[in-house]
């Protein structure tokens, strides 16, 4: 009798799993919707969401509605705090890892439940003397891709000016570049703010501000948005400037413009952290999205758009003429950040403490005196 009951129970479980019991719908492996809030560029997040939706269709025959709420890092962070554990989105993606730590302390993130294989493939940190964390030791966030904040330049414009290809930060101070450098103010761009911090933390406060004033003297424009810098450089209107690959820089290269990217020593590198918000309505879809991005297929989304893999397991490579190989050319031959030394001095705590004073000093010493600084060069 007991054996018959066991057989019937097994049959019922199988029937439920296959949806063979009338009126009973089998549970979906993940929810059919996913929403994220992110400062990551549309060029990247649209491609990642589209690739995941296709993967979900192939894997579970499930149509997942995906959507992204674009917001700058401070705005995104502020919204999450305001939601107080009842978020309107499922995932927070991009920005400084220190903000993710703050959200963890406020119990606004859910602990990730990634497979051990996915978690272990990502190193704990990269860079010296100040290691950049690539995953949260407490398990609440994980990096998705490596993206340096560096410089773009137009080789033909440089040649016309008699200036060698840009390799270092100091190359921007070449007198021959006067009026030909583009930048976006740190008051308008978090990436510019991070680069200003790199200079200040590399040289020290006094020498750092002297350097930044000299750069302002060489600058011919302060753009309204950071993404405008690679656009004006690509068109040959300016020779060089601060840029991030995913904010128009690589897109300009794909569009056929003569533009190159370099990450000088100590350039800030973000791991583009990702976390699931506490109280998310679609936690299974969110977890599946993160797992997907850490696969080779997911990492390829980044590698074909000028970013670098978060793990040494993969490197940027593809067929001749592919977008991946164009990305390698664009970055001067770099295929992985794990194949060479990474120098990092950026300290989140210092940057956070100086955030407002940096902007105040910029307005007083550079923005208000820009014309004087240009005449002094």
Tell me the role of every PLM-derived stretch:
Residues 277-344:
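Mature extracytoplasmic/periplasmic domains
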Residues 35, 170-190, 198-200:
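Short loop->beta-strand "edge-of-pocket" segments that line small-molecule binding or catalytic clefts
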Residues 69-78, 98, 170, 216-231, ...:
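Short helix-initiation/N-cap motifs at beta->coil->alpha
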Residues 336-377:
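Conserved C-terminal helix/tail region of periplasmic/extracytoplasmic solute-binding proteins
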Residues 28-102, 230:
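Early extracytoplasmic/lumenal segment of secretory-pathway proteins
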Residues 87-92, 110-152, 170, 180:
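A structural signal for short loop-to-beta-strand junctions that line the ligand-binding cleft
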């Amino acid at each position: 009798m007991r054996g018959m009951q066991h057989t019937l129970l097994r049959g019922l479980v199988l029937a439920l799993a296959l949806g063979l019991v009338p009126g009973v719908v089998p549970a979906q492996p993940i929810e059919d919707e996913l929403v994220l809030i992110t400062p990551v560029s549309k060029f990247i997040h649209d491609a990642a969401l589209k690739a995941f939706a296709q993967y979900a269709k192939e894997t579970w025959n499930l149509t997942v509605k995906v959507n992204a709420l674009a917001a700058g890092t401070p705005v995104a962070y502020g919204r999450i705090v305001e939601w107080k554990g009842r978020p309107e989105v499922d995932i927070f993606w991009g920005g400084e890892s220190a903000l993710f730590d703050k959200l963890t302390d406020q119990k606004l993130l859910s602990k990730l439940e990634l497979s051990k294989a996915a978690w272990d493939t990502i190193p704990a940190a990269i860079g010296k003397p100040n290691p950049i964390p690539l995953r949260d030791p407490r398990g609440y966030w994980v990096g998705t891709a490596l993206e340096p904040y560096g410089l773009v330049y137009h080789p033909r414009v440089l040649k016309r000016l008699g200036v060698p290809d840009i390799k270092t930060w100091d190359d921007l101070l070449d007198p021959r570049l006067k009026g030909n450098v583009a930048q976006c103010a740190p008051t308008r761009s978090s990436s510019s703010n991070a680069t200003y911090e790199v200079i200040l933390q590399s040289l020290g406060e006094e020498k750092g501000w002297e350097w930044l004033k000299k750069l302002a003297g060489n600058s011919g424009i302060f753009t309204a948005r950071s993404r405008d810098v690679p656009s004006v450089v690509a068109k040959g209107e300016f020779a060089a400037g601060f840029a991030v690959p995913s904010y128009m820089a690589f897109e300009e290269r794909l569009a056929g413009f003569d533009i190159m990217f370099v990450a000088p020593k100590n350039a800030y590198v973000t791991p583009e952290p990702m976390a699931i918000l506490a109280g998310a309505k679609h936690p299974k879809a969110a977890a599946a999205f993160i797992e997907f991005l850490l696969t080779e297929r997911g990492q390829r989304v980044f590698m074909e758009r000028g970013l670098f893999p978060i793990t040494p397991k993969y490197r940027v490579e593809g067929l001749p003429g592919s977008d991946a190989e164009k990305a390698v050319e664009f970055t001067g031959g770099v295929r992985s950040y794990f194949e060479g030394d990474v120098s990092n001095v950026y300290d989140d705590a210092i940057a956070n403490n100086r955030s407002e004073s940096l902007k105040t000093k910029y307005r007083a010493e550079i923005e208000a005196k820009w014309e004087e600084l240009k005449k002094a060069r």
